[in-house]
Each structure stands twice: as structure tokens, then as C-alpha cells.
Amino acid sequence: MTKMTNRAKQAEATKNKIYECGVKLIRKHGFDQVTVEQISKEAGVSVGTYYYYYQSKFDLFSEIFKRADEYFLNHVASNLSAKTFHEQVVEFFDKYADFNISDGIEMVKKLYTSDNKMFITKGRAMQKILQTIVEAGQSNYEITGYLSSQDITNMLFVTARGVIYEWCLYDGNLDLKEEMKKTITIMVKGLS
């Protein structure tokens, strides 16, 4: 493993600072109301420095989803303790609920708009992890093989996003983890 140079560490710190400031402003004002200039000012960097790390404001937005995928790859995929398909899917979406709760209701409300196409971007790590669980469930005859693993994965995410949207509608005054568990449990029972 190569050791990072001081310059590389500084560059990573600068990129993270821009990211954190951008997320803070997006959380507060919404994606469309925040400018690159505001993010740069908040981060204490020039606009040119911003564009060195992110080609556009949308690149920073994409980074939010990239980091969510990295979290699921590094902390969720290999740490699911459940054994059956049903239990694994419920546990996966419990972690998904936890992740949204940790982002905070205001940030999640800003992300959950019909203009945000990141949720339907194909091939994301989060989707691949769930699809692997679905494929194992199909291989073990725990769930239907009538639908493709991709279709089932998509349906489960559509359902989970609906639960999170409901949480947003109630301004976080809903037990997201309990609602997610109840809804996903019913959904996976229907796949048997």
C-alpha cells in the first residue's frame, strides 16, 4: 500500500472540505438554491479550486450518492448477519433507514424530489448488493424466479423510497425504522 504524500493528504482534505460545506448548504437551502460561489466561499476556497475537484455542482451532488454507495460497500454488504433472504432484505433496508436518519430529515427532504434522477441510475453499488441478495434467494428457492433479480431489486427500492418519502411528508415524525421493517417484511413475504 502506497503512503500518501502531504500534498495528496492536503488535496483530499480540501475536496472533503468542499464536500462538507456543499452538503451543509444543500441541507439548509436545497440543491437548486445553492451556487458554486456560495459553496466555495463557505469552504474558504476559490471557485477555480472548486472546479479543480468537481466539474459542476451536479458532480458534488453525485458525490453524495457515491459516498452512500461506498458506505454500503464497505460497512453493510459484508456485515449483514441475517441468514435467510427475507431476513437479509429486512436487515439491508434497516441499514438504509439508518443511513437516511443519519443524513437528517432536512437533507433527505432536499434529496427526495422527482428531479433527482440519481435514485434511478442503474448499476449503483447499493443496487448491486441488494441484487446479489435477491439472486441468492432465487438460487435457494426462497423467492420467486418468475421475476428477474433486477426487477425485484428495483421494486424493493421503489418501496423503500416510498417509505422514506412518507417519513419526509411527516417531517421525520414517524418511526422510519419501524415503518421500513413493517413495509419491507410485507413486500418480501409477497415474493415467496
Question: For each predicted feature, which ranges?
Answer:
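N-terminal intrinsically disordered/low-complexity leader segments
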Residues: 1-13
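Amphipathic, non-transmembrane alpha-helical scaffold segments
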Residues: 11, 15, 61, 65, ...
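Helix-turn-helix
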Residues: 13, 17, 25-59, 63
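Conserved hydrophobic residue
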Residues: 32, 143-144
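C-terminal peripheral helix-coil segments that are non-catalytic and often amphipathic
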Residues: 1-2, 82, 98, 132-140, ...
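Amphipathic alpha-helical packing segments from all-alpha helical-bundle domains
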Residues: 70-73, 115-142, 150-154, 158
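Hydrophobic alpha-helical connector segments
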Residues: 63, 74-102, 153-156, 177
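Amphipathic alpha-helical segments used for helix-helix packing
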Residues: 94-117
